[in-house]
Structure formats: C-alpha cells, structure tokens
C-alpha cells in the first residue's frame, strides 16, 4: 500500500521542555494507527505537527511523498482536542463556512450530518449543543472534505 504520511525524526520543544523526541512513523493508505501513551506524552502535539497546527523544532513531515505544505489540508481531515466550532452558528452553517473555503458541494454537508446523526438540529446554535453533539459536529467537519488522511484525537470524548 502507498505511504500517505511519513515523519523523520520529528521533534518539538517548548522552551526547555521536549514534548516530542525523534518520532519516525510511516502511515499507509487505508490503515488505522493509534498513538498510545500517558497524559503529557506528546500524542496531541505529534498530531498537530501532522496537520501543520504546530511546526516541528526539527525533523520532517511528508504527505503523499512530499514535504507537508498548506495545500495538503485539502486532503486531510482532523479533530484534535476541541472541535473548532463557531458557537453562534448552526451545525449546517458551521459546515457551510468550511465547504465554501474548500469548494465542497453543499450536498456533502447533508451526507456528513447524516453520518454523525446531526441532520435534525435545525437552527439550533452549536453553543447550545451538548458536549457529545459538539464532538459529533467536529467529526463531521473532519469528514467534510472526504479526506485521504483522517486524524482524530480522542474522538469519543463526551459522545452520548
């Protein structure tokens, strides 16, 4: 199978604290990988480097055989830690913002809302959602672009 993500000696320091130290991983298409470790082990930090949310102190992140760049976000879906929601917008409106930015057809919004069982939330604002509903909306956002690489950090947090 084709390699979709590869890291070489990935490191991340915050001041004098080493959060990630020499992580090398190869992720193949159509595979499921998990990062295991105690709190503070650097799992979320590593995932943030995979998506460009953090820059490595040293090392490289390769996506589809080339060094990661912003254009790759069109093919990556992610939910890391807290869902990135506009609390004053409905589920549909939250997805419409992203669909417009990524040139995704509006019918995809209905598809992902059905996948996460949020198709009947109407005009209710995301800020009024339960924690589980917010998490499901975050998963819908991650799935919206039908990503080649899907990164989920504790995706079952708060699910009802």
Describe the residue ranges of each PLM region:
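Helix-to-loop junction immediately C-terminal to a conserved catalytic motif
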Residues: 51
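Hydrophobic anchor residue at the start of the ABC signature
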Residues: 139
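Conserved ABC transporter NBD signature motif
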Residues: 59-74
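Catalytic Walker B motif of ABC-type/P-loop ATPase nucleotide-binding domains
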Residues: 150-154
